[in-house]
Amino acid sequence: AVNIPFKVKFRCKAAFC
């Protein structure tokens, strides 16, 4: 959630974070 890229940060919320 913090070590992920900025682009993935947005999808991370609905992807796996």
Curated annotation (Swiss-Prot):
It comes from the Eukaryota. Disulfide bonds join 12-17. It is found in: Secreted. GO terms for biological process: defense response to bacterium. Keywords: Amphibian defense peptide, Antibiotic, Antimicrobial, Disulfide bond, Secreted. GO terms for cellular component: extracellular region. Expressed by the skin glands. Belongs to the frog skin active peptide (FSAP) family. Ranatuerin subfamily. Antimicrobial peptide. This is Ranatuerin-2R. It comes from Pelophylax ridibundus. The lineage of its organism: Eukaryota, Metazoa, Chordata, Craniata, Vertebrata.
